[in-house]
């Protein structure tokens, strides 16, 4: 049985040279004409079409109803399932899509662990417009809502429900 500690052995076949050594990003670009690691907004590598911290995902998260599960890597998941359907459920044909999904999930979990929060709320605008007289800012409510989400993971309950 192969040693699982060596991550190079776990690479899909399309990412290996003929002699079995892993390809560099430049070799992958030359062979397939695709940049698998496009630079993200902040100069970090991005491995797939999904970006868990993108503004569109933040807005989508805020639009979810109570207790609805939120998956920031839904697009990568759909792509891998569609690939399986197209290829008669042969997993070997869809390794690239599975790797993209795994990388998205890793990025999501690492971001969550590093920051302690799923999203940064400083760039989210007030959906109701400017706060009127007597209203509090919208941002503290978002922070409280996200904090409750972090505590419950798959079940999202509004902060007001805990204030009863």
Curated annotation (Swiss-Prot):
Name of the protein described by the UniProt record: Cytochrome c oxidase-assembly factor COX23, mitochondrial
Keyword field contains Mitochondrion: yes
Keyword hit for Nucleotide-binding: no
Annotated function: Required for the assembly of cytochrome c oxidase.
Compartments where found: Mitochondrion intermembrane space
Renumbered ranges of motif Cx9C motif 2: 94-104
Motif Cx9C motif 1 location, chain numbering: 73-83
Family: Belongs to the COX23 family.
Record InterPro entries: COX23, Cys_alpha_HP_mot_SF
